[in-house]
Regions:
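Short catalytic/ligand-binding loop motif for oxyanion handling, primarily in non-cytosolic enzymes
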Residues: 35-36, 69-76, 130-136, 181-185, ...
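Substrate-binding cleft/loops of secretory-pathway carbohydrate-active enzymes
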Residues: 125-162, 167-226
Length: 411
């Protein structure tokens, strides 16, 4: 997915359609206590319900598990002797306690087994640790020493990261700058920032855009992480505050393009009308944008015969796709019946910005196909190949997201 994120469906107060761009990714964060209210009883129904709501809106789901915020870690876990300290936003548990680690691995395994290969999951944010699952202790004002003692050792940070890499192996992952981002990125994860747009939000002397993110990106493995995992940003404050404070929007958005942004969490708060045109242009460029430059194919074939299809594509976005979405072709009869369909072995995840490698496929026409003239359509499908999934930047779109491009004669 790409574009603006639908953050918790607007927490019951979603912006009107004219106030917020169209969304294809819903982003939810859940405390462990909600996901496993009783030991070993996982609340899959909660996630499934949100997936169904997201699907009804044409969205896939991105998730983060947190263990500190609000209800945080389950009381039954703390009752097993896991130390904790109350702080401003929740309860900070002892991340080094063997019982915490044992049960947290079980949790990630259970949710990975349930959702790790789901076509309904866009990406998983490697959270779990620290304030809001953001790998820090900034919520620990007044109890810094206890939080520091409870913060996981480097070995335990890597262990927890490994559980996400293992149990969500088929799912795009992102990790906040800090923590074990270098380690996660070296294993295919993308990265996220949580204060996008900050060029002086908190201080005239220090800001995230110049002083927090660029040093992180000096690590080549993180700077290149976008080639294998998504870059997801969360706006600093709210966009209407940027507008009121006179922020340089073009500077902010251009930096997002340079960082190969795919998803922007604008917290489901209205975008100022005066800025909508600039955001609309920005949204045409973030993530992927596939243009079919040329398609050549056999003009005719026969039942059981070959059909040669050659195509040239260009990705006009700033990032690839991160799911194994296949390129597909089909033949359609004059009565709109799909009479043949094929998927290409081409790996579209390799289609970085710019011209893509030439795709050459030879498919076999079904033996049973009657002679006649057939429409040739193309699409990029979902992982399970059940439906067309990707909007292409070309003409010819049909209601089912396939694109009618040409005709083939079967003799």
């Amino acid at each position: 997915g790409m574009g603006f994120a639908d953050f918790h469906f607007g927490f019951g107060h979603p912006p009107a359609p004219e106030e917020y761009p169209h969304t294809t990714v819903a982003y939810f964060r859940w405390p462990w206590a909600e996901l496993e209210p009783k030991e070993g009883q996982y609340n899959f129904a909660l996630v499934d319900r949100v997936i169904e709501q997201a699907k009804a809106k044409g969205e896939t789901l991105a998730i983060r598990i947190v263990s500190e915020y609000k209800t945080g870690s389950p009381q039954w876990l703390l009752d097993k002797g896991v130390g904790s300290v109350k702080e401003s936003d929740g309860i900070f548990p002892d991340y080094n306690h063997p019982v915490f680690l044992d049960y947290h691995e079980r949790l990630i395994r259970a949710f990975g087994e349930r959702y790790g290969r789901s076509v309904d999951i866009d990406h998983v944010d490697i959270g779990s640790i620290g304030c809001w699952g953001e790998w820090n202790t900034v919520c620990c004002e007044g109890v810094e020493a206890q939080c520091k003692a409870f913060f996981p050792t480097e070995a335990n940070q890597i262990a927890i990261t490994d559980w996400y890499l293992k149990y969500f192996a088929g799912t795009p992952l992102v990790m906040l700058h800090g923590g074990q981002l270098k380690y996660a990125a070296s294993h295919g994860a993308g990265w996220r920032g949580d204060c996008f747009g900050d060029y002086g939000y908190f201080s005239p002397d220090w800001n995230h855009m110049e002083h927090a993110y660029p040093p992180v990106l000096e690590e080549a493995v993180i700077a290149n992480a976008w080639k294998r995992g998504p870059v997801q940003m969360e706006v600093c404050g709210y966009i209407h505050e940027w507008y009121e404070r006179g922020f340089d929007l073009d500077r902010i958005l251009n930096q997002g393009l340079e960082w190969h942004l795919s998803v922007l969490n604008a917290k489901s708060k209205p975008v100022p009308a005066a800025w909508r045109p600039r955001f609309n242009e920005f949204l045409k460029r973030i993530g992927y944008r596939f243009v079919l430059r040329e398609l050549t194919h056999s003009a005719e074939s026969h039942p059981g015969g070959p059909l040669v299809l050659q195509s040239r594509w260009e990705n006009k976005g700033v990032a690839p796709i991160y799911h194994a979405w296949p390129l597909a072709y089909r033949l359609r009869s004059s009565s709109d019946q799909v009479v043949a369909q094929w998927t290409s072995p081409a790996d579209l995840k390799q289609w970085l910005p710019g011209p893509s490698p030439r795709v050459e496929d030879t498919v076999v026409v079904p033996e049973t196909l009657s002679a006649g003239s057939y429409a040739l359509d193309v699409a990029i499908l979902s992982e399970d190949a059940r439906s067309a999934h990707v909007e292409l930047a070309i003409e010819g779109k049909r209601a089912d997201r396939w694109y009618a491009l040409s005709r083939v004669e079967i003799r």
